[in-house]
Amino acid sequence: MSNFEERVKKIIIEQLGVKEEEVKNEASFVDDLGADSLDTVELVMALEEEFDTDIPDDEAEKITTVQAAIDYVVSSAE
């Protein structure tokens, strides 16, 4: 597991209050992890803070799964 992946998953666990074993890469924030729209906004804000980046709204809307969050963070770091 990459450092980025570990950090993203840690944020998801903290923000959504879910168990580590529930945070699978294919998990949907809403359908699998029980997030609502406010949770997803707060999650994006936490990712922005952790990785010192700005995620535009049109990109944030596409971040709906754990893997999408990891992919975005990795691509923005390159």
Curated annotation (Swiss-Prot):
The modification O-(pantetheine 4'-phosphoryl)serine is found at S37. SUPFAM superfamilies: ACP-like (SSF47336). It holds the Pfam family PP-binding. InterPro entries: ACP, ACP-like_sf, PP-bd_ACP, Ppantetheine_attach_site. GO terms for biological process: lipid A biosynthetic process. Keywords: Cytoplasm, Fatty acid biosynthesis, Fatty acid metabolism, Lipid biosynthesis, Lipid metabolism, Phosphopantetheine, Phosphoprotein. It is found in: Cytoplasm. GO terms for molecular function: acyl binding; acyl carrier activity. Residues 2-77 form the Carrier domain. The keyword Protease does not apply. 4'-phosphopantetheine is transferred from CoA to a specific serine of apo-ACP by AcpS. This modification is essential for activity because fatty acids are bound in thioester linkage to the sulfhydryl of the prosthetic group. Pathway: Lipid metabolism; fatty acid biosynthesis. Its main location: cytoplasm. GO terms for cellular component: cytosol; membrane. Belongs to the acyl carrier protein (ACP) family. Carrier of the growing fatty acid chain in fatty acid biosynthesis. Is probably involved in the biosynthesis of docosahexaenoic acid (DHA) which is produced by this bacterium as a fatty acyl component in its membrane lipid. HAMAP family: Acyl_carrier (MF_01217). This is Acyl carrier protein. It comes from Moritella marina. The gene is acpP.
